């Protein structure tokens, strides 16, 4: 049985405080089961963990926020090449709706990438989500790259940690305006900012 959802595409500056609070609750509930550390950035009314998205795709149902995907245009450095991407992040589906196919509805975001003139969508996920992303790939062109180190700055400068961290996450690339063969080769990606 599929949940009936209504999708809303909105720019970050269109969100009201009450919506940030509702999204923060959603992220604590969605990311909390993966570990309390993952829910910590969403304390209070903060509805982002690292970099703040510029555009959000939010699904609502009768119980509130059902799913979310954030987007941020940025240049990442792959080897010596600066590559414009639409970074995807802050992805989540409410736990009671997992497995119902709602996550695949995020393909509604793909035409938006064309409007934003980004040649690739880019994101990173932990290896435990590889099967989920592979299923997502059945509905459109998705390339999963492993063995790539991704450098990101921390969301806030801290005295007790270095200013950057390096992850060995899976890299997700969706070709939008170009062929995947145009994606630069390299084993290190520098976000030049915090993860979305």
From Swiss-Prot:
- The EC number(s) attached to this protein equal 2.3.1.-
What role does this protein play? N-acyltransferase required for nodulation. Acts in the production of a small, heat-stable compound (Nod) that stimulates mitosis in various plant protoplasts.
Xref: Pfam families:
NodA
Name it.
Nodulation protein A
GO MF: acyltransferase activity
Carries keyword Endoplasmic reticulum? Answer: no
Please state which protein family the record places this protein in: Belongs to the NodA family.
Q: Which residues cross the membrane?
A: none
Instruction: Report the GO terms under cellular component.
Output: cytosol
Stored InterPro entries: Acyl_CoA_acyltransferase (IPR016181), NodA (IPR003484), Nodulation_prot_NodA_CS (IPR020567)
Q: Which domain of life is it from?
A: Bacteria
Enumerate the subcellular locations listed in this protein's record, separating them with semicolons.
Cytoplasm
Q: Which organism is it from?
A: Rhizobium tropici
Is Cytoplasm set as a keyword in this record? Answer: yes
Q: Which UniProt keywords apply?
A: Acyltransferase, Cytoplasm, Nodulation, Plasmid, Transferase
